[in-house]
Amino acid sequence: MKRGYLHSIGRLRHVLRLCALALVLALTPVIIKADDDNLLKVDRVDFSVTLSDGNAYTIAGFLYYKGSFRNRPLQVLVHGGSYNHKYWDAPTINGQSYSYARFMAEEGYALLAIDQLGAGESSKPAGDFVTLNETTLSIHQVLAQMRSGNNPLGYAFQQIVLVGHSFGSINSIFVQGTFHDADALVVTALGHVPHELPIPPELIIALAQFPYFPLPAEARSALFYFADAADADVIAYDNLNLADLLTRGQLFTTFAAVFNPAADRVGAVTGPVLVQLGEHDSLWPSLYAGGEAAFWTNASSVTVESLPIVGHAFNTHLDNKTGWKSINRWIRSTLAVN
């Protein structure tokens, strides 16, 4: 009898193990799906654009989102000169996060960080062809594709915010003033109040000898960083891994539009605008923030913010999140995003 009792106990344990295994197998797809919904993803998305010469070119984009990109506001990120899309997705260094794209994806946005014409993995036509007009025409076509659904994702975004940095801000202003593609515009590290820029004329003359050229590391460090508010390891990483090339066409057209409101079409921009200027930006400091709003004569609203403790490359300074959080609040308020 004892032997039969022990045998029954053994069978019961075996059955319980099988039931437990079946339960685990039944729940496994649900667990994987839950993990997948919480996963931050980055997808390569290429756009075909046609420029003034009638030829097709490729603009490389990188889509950041968490779970799904559907039913989310889209931020289209436009990097500045001598950068590519990686400006928006610098890594964590010494425990500090420097990725604007990943920060905003965690906040519920979809973000398309593009490599502008002539930079990163986008097409590289002749350097003199890559001008303000051609660059902005390519950005316009990317925005139109994302709005219409005629894009590699096959999805039409209902709310689009155009976000620029430095030269990318000039291009974004021109696009919005010409085509009005976005629902809102965020301009960082770029102002319109005339002042002297700390760029030696001899440097410009030297760079203009080449159709594509890098900015020297010493110049990038001095112009883009407020050393007291940045990690030296990040500055070194920037020069080694984030730096890209500029074109002579951009030098003579985009740079020439810096303090020319008619050239960048700031007065033709409609819709809401947020401008962020850094206190220690050696190129466009917040010292001139008080006069900035006057240039946006047709914008439905203009908010100008001064950010302390940052230099020109906002994202790669230690206090980057002050500006990021403010952009997030402004977009949510402006577009009524939940």
Task: Show the residue positions of the predicted features.
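N-terminal cap/lid segment of alpha/beta-hydrolase-fold proteins
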Residues: 36-70
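Short, surface-exposed "cap/lid" segments of acyl-processing enzymes
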Residues: 69-109
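Alpha/beta-hydrolase active-site loop
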Residues: 129-152
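Alpha/beta-hydrolase fold nucleophile elbow
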Residues: 152-166
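Alpha/beta-hydrolase-fold enzymes
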Residues: 163-248
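Short beta-strand/loop motif that positions the catalytic acidic residue
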Residues: 269, 275-277
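Conserved alpha/beta-hydrolase "acid-adjacent" motif
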Residues: 278, 282-290
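Catalytic histidine-centered segment of alpha/beta-hydrolase-like enzymes
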Residues: 310-321
